[in-house]
């Protein structure tokens, strides 16, 4: 369990990804231009890219209830075909999931537990992009230059409503409405 200062300001959320069988270079290059990594702007976003062996890697879908879909491969395959209907015949060969930590405002939570104890969590699915920056800011602060780190420390991170027992059901209901 987390220390009281930060407990309740993050919540675990399941997120999932699937990989298709190799699609072949020509077919794969027709899906995503310049082999870009892509994410949409939906609140619960989809993200995708091609692997080195021309598989479609497609992620997204979340579980706020801490229950995984019964069949992750089928769930992610359906989401993928919604975005790429031309992949309806592509077989999903790998699928997996895990937890990320989200914050109420979906911004990473950086701060100090004491003068020399720093933390960074709650990257809300943006960890690949932002953890390197957070590590650099913490390193600067440890070395005595904390101005940039302190900018993030001033962001107001509210606790999830409902306390430890009701926050997950409350979020599930809110997302069902959304």
Residues covered by each model-derived region:
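Active-site substrate-recognition segment that forms the wall
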Residues: 1-115
